[in-house]
């Protein structure tokens, strides 16, 4: 018999229905559930797949470099970053008529092209790339690295090169390797690149492989380093009149603590960033020498955790038993990693616009909007995944005996208190915030806008003032001219900080008012509700009052039959499924807020946001409707323009999003009827009927249909907003 998909499951591969295909796809990456799997094989497969993942990332980055070098305008852009539009790649499309060809021929290109809104041009420019040859070199190098990683992936699946299970569970060695080797040494290498290549390039020099070892990045070379006079490296920084990419106004410092932004590029000082990476390198290289491996010195993670016991009171056994629980559970480790990565990704979104590291990024409004939105959505999905794997940990890997009375067990024991507090916070935020918005709407509708309830965010304004923002008149800490901190700051540390905080040219500390107060609490509602659903799903994964035996049913199940009430829609998977809708909803509010506040600032029209954001009609009319006008009229009987593709994507995104409801509301999405109709027509068509459909179409399971519905809802939602964001921003600012 010919082996059929999925090879990893004997039972599924013999299923005569379309369930075989659906369940095969659903469990393809659930290595734990595959036939003949062992713990060792599981670890080896995951290890090899990491190399494959890295190879894909390097291939993708290589493709970016290659296509810009081949079809972009990097060298032209470098001459005038503020006025030349960066080209991502050419468009070859047989459907383009003459109007489309003309509309998409821009940025000095000979034919239709896509404009880059990813910020890669600014990134490459900042780190010292200047011409197409540099881009090609980078592309070829990354291609070689990708090939190397693919080879490593294959190699580590060969019998002689398979790592043992004990190697994978050697937590201290892995910590040392990741801290010192990956974070520490790579930060040191990046410091080296910034000092030897990027900073000289920014000052009009040109350093490449042929003169890298002969060009000293500082006039005094390594002398100050060996003599202990490190402060020499911070003397004579670039002046405020420095022209980026030239020696006009350039200094000689390589490690500084200036603070604020380069006045021309509106990005962080390169010498500050080199200093930052050097500090990170030192800290992490030291951190990577702290854990005990072959040499019998340093800390043992197990001893550290076992020592974490409350000194008295009825506080249980602290972190006892956690070492083995974490070290033997891939889901626990993945949950921790995803939670950390999710937070970091969201922080990247926040910092890329408030403290831009790349030259001229702050003046490329569409790119800023795209990068913020992109990183916030990615963060949302990653964070939801953290809770999903946390729930799977409780179902598959949690051992109550091993964790008796430690922090994990105690968290499960008082889960009702955790869940009810989250519920209370969500209800409070929801009713009060909506109440304020609706009250304000009614006042405007009845012609008495002065009766709105407008609350100044005084605590947040006070915090901004403490950090040096003077416009609120609080006169506290750094915003007080008499405080020792603000006096020291002007000379000793970060002298550029106070200027940056009080400048209107950046997004560092935006002025906030009643509209910000309201939307802040709307976002807080979304965050708390999403967290409530996810936390409840994980904490109730093993069992709840309604269903104490839930852990026998696994991660996802629709119901326990018709005879047992209260068992529907309460699996841990269902919590994840519901939470993703709330996550998307919350990030919708976050990105709406960010985008509307910024376009009004960029247009010099901050009053529009301040006046219209205090009631819901303001958001619907003055943000969504007003900014979608170009999309709604993107192509019409009189022709099209360079926004037409976004107008089409806006429409298409709505279509995909709406398709989700076919699966979400009627549950099964008519899969059985659809496929049977297609198969019937296929088998009655000459030539086509030579190939016959063998799998009997059966209705999607409830869980499958929810997944398909959720996937369409998410993809459509993001497509729609991406088109709206890019078109409305690029339509205004070019």
From Swiss-Prot:
Top-level taxon of origin: Eukaryota
Topology relative to the membrane: Multi-pass membrane protein
GO CC aspect terms: chloroplast thylakoid membrane; photosystem I
Family annotation (InterPro entries): PSI_PsaA/B, PSI_PsaA/B_CS, PSI_PsaA/B_sf, PSI_PsaB
Biological processes, Gene Ontology terms: photosynthesis
EC number: 1.97.1.12
GO molecular function: 4 iron, 4 sulfur cluster binding; chlorophyll binding; electron transfer activity; magnesium ion binding; oxidoreductase activity
Family label: Belongs to the PsaA/PsaB family.
Free-text function comment from the UniProt entry: PsaA and PsaB bind P700, the primary electron donor of photosystem I (PSI), as well as the electron acceptors A0, A1 and FX. PSI is a plastocyanin-ferredoxin oxidoreductase, converting photonic excitation into a charge separation, which transfers an electron from the donor P700 chlorophyll pair to the spectroscopically characterized acceptors A0, A1, FX, FA and FB in turn. Oxidized P700 is reduced on the lumenal side of the thylakoid membrane by plastocyanin.
Protein name listed in UniProt: Photosystem I P700 chlorophyll a apoprotein A2
């Amino acid at each position: 018999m010919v082996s059929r998909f999925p090879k990893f499951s004997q039972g599924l591969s013999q299923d005569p229905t379309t369930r075989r295909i659906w369940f095969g796809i659903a469990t393809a990456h659930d290595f734990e559930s595959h036939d003949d799997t062992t713990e060792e094989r599981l670890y080896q497969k995951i290890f090899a797949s990491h190399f494959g993942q890295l190879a894909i990332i390097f291939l993708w980055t290589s493709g970016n470099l290659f296509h810009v070098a081949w079809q972009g305008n990097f060298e032209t852009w470098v001459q005038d970053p503020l006025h030349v539009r960066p080209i991502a790649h050419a468009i070859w499309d047989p459907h383009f008529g003459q109007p489309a060809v003309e509309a998409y021929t821009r940025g000095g290109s000979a034919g239709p092209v896509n404009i880059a809104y990813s910020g890669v041009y600014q990134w490459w420019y900042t780190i010292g790339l200047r011409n197409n040859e540099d881009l090609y070199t980078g592309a070829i190098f990354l291609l070689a690295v990708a090939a190397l990683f693919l080879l490593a992936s294959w190699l580590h699946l060969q019998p002689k090169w398979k790592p043992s299970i004990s190697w994978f569970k050697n937590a201290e060695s892995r910590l040392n390797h990741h801290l010192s080797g990956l974070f520490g040494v790579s930060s040191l290498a990046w410091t080296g690149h910034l000092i030897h290549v990027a900073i000289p390039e920014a000052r009009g020099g040109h350093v490449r492989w042929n003169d890298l070892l002969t060009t000293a990045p500082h006039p005094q070379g390594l002398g100050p380093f060996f003599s202990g006079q490190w402060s020499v490296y911070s003397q004579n920084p670039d002046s405020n009149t420095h022209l980026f990419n030239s020696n006009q106004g350039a200094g000689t410092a390589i490690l500084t603590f200036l603070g604020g932004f380069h006045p021309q590029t509106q990005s962080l000082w390169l010498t500050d960033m080199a200093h930052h990476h050097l500090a990170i390198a030192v800290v992490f290289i030291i951190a990577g020498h702290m854990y005990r491996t072959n040499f019998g010195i340093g800390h043992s993670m197990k001893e550290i955790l076992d020592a974490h016991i409350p000194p008295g009171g009825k506080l249980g056994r602290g972190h006892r038993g956690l070492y083995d629980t974490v070290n033997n559970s891939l889901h626990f480790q993945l949950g921790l990693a995803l939670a950390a990565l999710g937070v970091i990704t969201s922080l990247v979104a926040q910092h890329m616009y408030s403290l831009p590291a790349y030259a001229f990024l702050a003046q490329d409004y569409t790119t800023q909007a795209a990068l913020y939105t992109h990183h916030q959505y990615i963060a949302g999905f990653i964070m939801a995944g953290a809770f999903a794997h946390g729930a799977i940990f409780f179902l598959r890997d949690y051992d109550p005996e091993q964790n008796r009375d430690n922090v994990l067990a105690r968290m499960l024991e008082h889960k009702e208190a955790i869940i009810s507090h989250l519920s209370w916070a969500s209800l409070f935020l929801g009713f009060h915030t909506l109440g304020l918005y609706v009250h304000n709407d009614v006042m405007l509708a009845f012609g008495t806008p002065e009766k709105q309830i407008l609350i100044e965010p005084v605590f947040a304004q006070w915090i901004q003032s403490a950090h040096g923002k003077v416009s609120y008149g609080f006169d506290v800490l750094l915003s007080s001219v008499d405080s020792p901190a603000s006096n020291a700051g002007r000379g000793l540390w970060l002298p550029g900080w106070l200027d940056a905080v009080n400048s209107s040219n950046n997004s560092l500390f935006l002025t906030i008012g009643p509209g910000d107060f309201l939307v802040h609490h709307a976002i807080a509602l979304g965050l708390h509700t999403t967290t409530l659903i996810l936390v409840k799903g994980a904490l109730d994964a093993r069992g709840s009052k309604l269903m104490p035996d839930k852990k026998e049913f696994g991660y996802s199940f629709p119901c326990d039959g018709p005879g047992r009430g209260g068992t529907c829609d309460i699996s841990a998977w269902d919590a994840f499924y519901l939470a993703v809708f709330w996550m998307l909803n919350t990030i919708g509010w976050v990105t709406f807020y960010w985008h509307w506040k910024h376009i009004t600032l960029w247009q010099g029209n901050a009053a529009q946001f301040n006046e219209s954001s205090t009631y819901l009609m303001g958001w619907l009319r003055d943000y969504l409707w007003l900014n979608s006008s170009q999309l709604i009229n993107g192509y019409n009987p009189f022709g099209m323009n360079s926004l037409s593709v976004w107008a089409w994507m806006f429409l298409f995104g709505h279509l995909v999003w709406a398709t989700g409801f076919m699966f979400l509301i009627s549950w099964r999405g008519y899969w059985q009827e659809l496929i049977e109709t297609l198969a019937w027509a296929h088998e009655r068509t000459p030539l086509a009927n030579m190939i016959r459909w063998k799998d009997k179409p059966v209705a999607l399971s409830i869980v499958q249909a929810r997944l398909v519905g959720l996937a369409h809802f998410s993809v459509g939602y993001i497509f729609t907003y991406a088109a709206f964001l890019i078109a409305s921003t690029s339509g205004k600012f070019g």
